[in-house]
């Protein structure tokens, strides 16, 4: 099975005026979803198209943006490949960008190659595009994705008719509609539109295909959706804290997760600490929630380097460790303090180990690590950067992948605390985690925690 280290974001806009600057701005607000590649396509009689290796604001020049003429277009930020991808087809030029992961990419590519199709590198975006192109029209092509693809996708397709936006039938990855008097937009996160003076209209429904043009938003097809399976990791980590995903404020969900951790400490006899602190920036919302419930003073213990990339979305472990070191430096205030340190999750354990080590080296008296997510037990098949069971720290201690009792969880926490050098470690239980997200359990994908896929793989 293939597990792509993938985080990415899409943005599209149909405007009354030239749109390239707006797409550039929208992608900048989605940059946290992927920093390795970026691209913009616009339509003006034909598709204008530019992609880069690197960050949006570092690479697109004013001259390039001026060359991207047209009043509607799409953009993409990614960890893995260049998107959007432009195609000449029998229905005219199109450009395609998506967020997600095609699990059965190898099988689909082999089938297409046996039928005479060629591929550049076999990227998921090539497979998705070719499935769309094989059909007589874009709507039929997007519809065919639900029949052929195992995995997740939220996508935008640029055409002469406008922009088609669609979400897979489970709604794994977010996709939001919004706009103002000058434009209609679609984005992986609401923050892009909120910060561009746009109103948030609604989420694209699982299986919905929306056409965005001068008339606004038109649902041109609604595919049957077996169930919702929104990625729970969006609220815990992936999405920006100022976004709203499927009707839930990310900030509220993270505050709830922190409060839940504090409540568990209170229920288990309380904890004596001087300060509660986040691992920036992923632990901020959780730490604020913990502070609110516990009444322990909130205090930063790390100085965050805003110019460093997200370490979790770096491709290699060496790159992650180097980036993590660049991101954070310890504040001397920590000396002699008992610290509750909050973060979203423990994946491989390397980064939290180094942070605990740095804090103790700086003189912290005690470090109590509190983690918002339950232990990660399974690699994600649907697009988050975890590749194999062997890389997951919790799985090294729970070989079956199933935590069946509170006693088993407590034992795991003690083993991880010893491994990372912390005085204690606690995770949210699965029940507490789901309750904090304010979304029914049967509307979430929790596969990385419990190994249960919402669809047949």
What are these language model-derived features?
Residues 167, 188, 214, 278-281, ...:
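Active-site proximal loops enriched in glycine and acidic residues that flank catalytic Cys/His/Asp
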């Amino acid at each position: 099975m293939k597990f792509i280290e993938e985080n990415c974001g899409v943005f599209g806009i149909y405007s009354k005026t030239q749109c390239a600057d707006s797409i550039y701005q929208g992608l900048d607000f989605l940059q946290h979803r992927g920093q390795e590649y970026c691209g913009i396509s616009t339509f003006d009689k034909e598709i204008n198209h530019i992609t880069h290796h690197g960050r949006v604001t570092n690479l697109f020049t004013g001259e390039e943006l001026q060359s991207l003429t047209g009043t509607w277009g799409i953009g993409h930020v990614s960890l893995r490949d260049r998107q959007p991808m432009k195609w000449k087809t029998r229905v005219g030029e199109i450009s395609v960008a998506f967020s997600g992961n095609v699990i059965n990419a190898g099988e689909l590519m082999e089938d297409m190659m046996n039928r005479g199709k060629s591929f550049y590198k076999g990227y998921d975006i090539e497979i998705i595009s070719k499935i769309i192109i094989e059909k007589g029209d874009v709507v039929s092509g997007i519809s065919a994705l639900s029949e052929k693809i195992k995995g997740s996708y939220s996508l935008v397709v640029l055409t002469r008719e406008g922009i088609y936006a669609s979400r897979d039938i489970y709604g794994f990855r977010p996709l939001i509609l919004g706009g103002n008097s000058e434009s209609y937009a679609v984005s992986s996160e609401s923050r892009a539109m909120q910060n561009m003076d746009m109103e948030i209209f609604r989420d694209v429904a699982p299986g919905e295909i929306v056409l965005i043009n001068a008339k606004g938003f038109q649902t041109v097809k609604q595919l049957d959706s077996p169930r919702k399976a929104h990625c729970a990791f969006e609220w815990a980590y992936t999405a920006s804290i100022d976004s709203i995903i499927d009707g839930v404020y990310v900030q509220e969900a993270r505050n709830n997760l922190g409060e839940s951790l504090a409540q568990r400490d209170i229920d288990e006899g309380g904890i004596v600490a001087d300060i509660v602190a986040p691992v920036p920036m992923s632990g901020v919302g959780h730490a604020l929630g913990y502070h609110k419930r516990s009444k322990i003073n909130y205090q930063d213990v790390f100085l965050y380097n805003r110019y460093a990339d997200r370490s979790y979305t770096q491709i290699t472990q060496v790159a992650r460790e180097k980036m993590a070191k660049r991101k954070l430096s310890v504040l001397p205030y920590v000396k002699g303090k008992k610290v509750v340190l909050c973060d979203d999750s423990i994946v491989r354990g390397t980064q939290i180990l180094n942070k605990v080590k740095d804090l103790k080296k700086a003189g912290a008296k005690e470090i109590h690590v509190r983690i918002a997510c339950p232990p990660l037990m399974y690699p994600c098949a649907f697009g988050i950067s975890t590749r194999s069971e062997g890389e997951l720290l919790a799985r090294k201690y729970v070989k079956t992948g199933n935590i069946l009792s509170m006693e088993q969880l407590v034992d795991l926490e003690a083993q991880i605390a010893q491994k990372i050098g912390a005085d204690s470690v606690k995770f949210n239980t699965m029940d507490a985690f789901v309750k904090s997200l304010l979304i029914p359990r049967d509307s979430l994908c929790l596969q990385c925690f419990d190994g249960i896929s919402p669809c047949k793989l």
